[in-house]
Every structure is written in C-alpha cells, then in structure tokens.
Amino acid sequence: MANTPSAKKRAKQAEKRRSHNASLRSMVRTYIKNVVKAIDAKDLEKAQAAFTAAVPVIDRMADKGIIHKNKAARHKSRLSGHIKALSTAAA
C-alpha cells in the first residue's frame, strides 16, 4: 500500500485511468461486436453501416494507446474481409 502522499495520489490516479481505459476498451469491443452480429445475420447494409461507425472509434482508441495500433489494423482488416466476402456471396 502507498505510504507517501504522492504515492497515494499516484495510486488514485492509476485506478481512475484503469477504470476509464476499461470503459473505452469495452466501447471498442461493442462496436466490433455490432459489426460481427450484422455479418452473422448476413445483412450487408447493416454490416457496412456498423463497420463505417466502428473504424473511427477503433482508430481513435489506437491513437490514444488504449489498444495497440497493430491490433486495430487487424480488427479492421478482418472485419473488412468478412464484409467483402459477404458482398461477393450476395452478388
């Protein structure tokens, strides 16, 4: 446990950051989940709309360091590939 006043303050700040970052990570997962649900339902329009909404959120979290930039790129790439496969299957 923190003994000095500065260590107590840092512990409090770290806990505050941890909970805020957890909230942001949860938000990213929700956006990704919305795209996946639309893909699973084979709803191309809804999937594209959800993907369009998710991309800026994923990028923003990568810029802030909430998720790694490579992880953001991997999510976008895989979701984009699934949507592309869905559109070719529908055509």
Swiss-Prot record:
Keywords: Ribonucleoprotein, Ribosomal protein, RNA-binding, rRNA-binding. PANTHER family: 30S RIBOSOMAL PROTEIN S20 (PTHR33398), SMALL RIBOSOMAL SUBUNIT PROTEIN BS20C (PTHR33398:SF1). Binds directly to 16S ribosomal RNA. GO terms for molecular function: small ribosomal subunit rRNA binding; structural constituent of ribosome. InterPro entries: Ribosomal_bS20, Ribosomal_bS20_sf. Pfam families: Ribosomal_S20p. Belongs to the bacterial ribosomal protein bS20 family. NCBIfam families: S20. GO terms for biological process: translation. Residues 1-23 are annotated as: Disordered. GO terms for cellular component: cytosol; small ribosomal subunit. The keyword Lipid metabolism does not apply. The keyword Cytoplasm does not apply. Residues 7-20 have a biased composition (Basic residues). This is Small ribosomal subunit protein bS20.
